[in-house]
């Protein structure tokens, strides 16, 4: 989602609170044009660092610390299992059968906690 100069490309981190805090601190610089040039501020939700944080003047990185929890009973109702598996950049999510129903499992050692799933 995009708000001001700070943006996030996935739902892994809610950028609203971070945007508010950062812009509250920097608003004076933007209002009075105290900066020598354009200032690029970017927010990335995970270590993939989309949002061009690698080439920004100020980069904010959201770090998640826990693997996703799986609701095996409702998984098939809310998503397509092949898409969930394909969304994982490290192949930490793979199809599995739980209690006779199709589901997924997370290999925690491979998970980078990006929230893409």
PLM-predicted stretches and their roles:
Residues 44-45, 105-107:
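Glycine-rich, charged/polar anion/phosphate-binding loops
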Residues 83-103, 110-117:
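Iron-sulfur cluster-binding cysteine motifs and their immediate structural context
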Residues 64-66, 70, 96-99, 105-106:
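Acidic low-complexity intrinsically disordered segments
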Residues 13, 79, 108-112:
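A short glycine-/small-residue-rich loop at the edge of a beta-strand within enzyme catalytic domains
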Residues 1-78:
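Small-residue-enriched alpha-helical segments and adjacent helix-cap loops
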């Amino acid at each position: 989602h995009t708000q001001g100069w700070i943006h996030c490309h996935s739902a892994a981190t809610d950028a609203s609170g971070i945007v508010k805090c950062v812009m509250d601190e920097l608003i004076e610089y933007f209002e009075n044009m105290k900066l020598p040039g354009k200032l690029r501020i970017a927010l990335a939700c995970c270590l993939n660092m989309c949002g061009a944080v690698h080439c920004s003047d100020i980069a904010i990185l959201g770090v998640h610390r826990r693997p996703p929890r799986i609701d095996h009973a409702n998984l098939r109702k809310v998503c397509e299992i092949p898409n969930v598996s394909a969304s994982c950049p490290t192949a930490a999510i793979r199809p599995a059968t739980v209690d006779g129903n199709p589901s997924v499992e997370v290999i925690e050692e491979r998970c980078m906690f990006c929230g893409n799933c």
